[in-house]
Amino acid sequence: MIQQQTYLNVADNSGARKLMCLRVLSTGNCRYGGIGDQIIAVVKEAIPNMGVKKSDVVRAVIVRTRQPLRRASGMSIRFDDNAAVIINAEGNPKGTRVFGPVARELRDKNFTKIVSLAPEVI
């Protein structure tokens, strides 16, 4: 459950370390975002001399949340942190690697490139 002012870790090698959510992009006037939702965020921490700099406004997709995710089978999944992957306007990741596990629900929301880069899909 991600809302405005939420800090997220960055799960790729685009150069950013931490993001702060500015707006959840979803259908309707939704306050919270979950796994697979796109957000507009600002970079709060970044690695020097990389593609993304501090205070850049970027688009990202949420890949992990601490809020439990309930599946249709009755199983719930909860991750250790809130994390996102920075994407471009077409929805492709800016980085070339994705760190940590991602949820299977990303495949249903047409983020197959992120799923294929991830080391583990849960």
Swiss-Prot record:
Cellular component, GO annotation: cytosolic large ribosomal subunit
InterPro entries (UniProt xref): Ribosomal_uL14, Ribosomal_uL14_bac-type, Ribosomal_uL14_CS, Ribosomal_uL14_sf
Name of the protein described by the UniProt record: Large ribosomal subunit protein uL14
CDD domains hit by this protein: Ribosomal_uL14
Subunit note: Part of the 50S ribosomal subunit. Forms a cluster with proteins L3 and L19. In the 70S ribosome, L14 and L19 interact and together make contacts with the 16S rRNA in bridges B5 and B8.
One GO MF term attached to the UniProt entry: large ribosomal subunit rRNA binding
Gene3D superfamilies: Ribosomal protein L14
Organism field: Picosynechococcus sp. (strain ATCC 27264 / PCC 7002 / PR-6)
Purpose of the protein: Binds to 23S rRNA. Forms part of two intersubunit bridges in the 70S ribosome.
Signal peptide interval: none
Family according to the record: Belongs to the universal ribosomal protein uL14 family.
Entries under HAMAP family matching the protein: Ribosomal_uL14
Keywords: Ribonucleoprotein, Ribosomal protein, RNA-binding, rRNA-binding
BP terms from Gene Ontology: translation
Keyword Transferase set for record: no
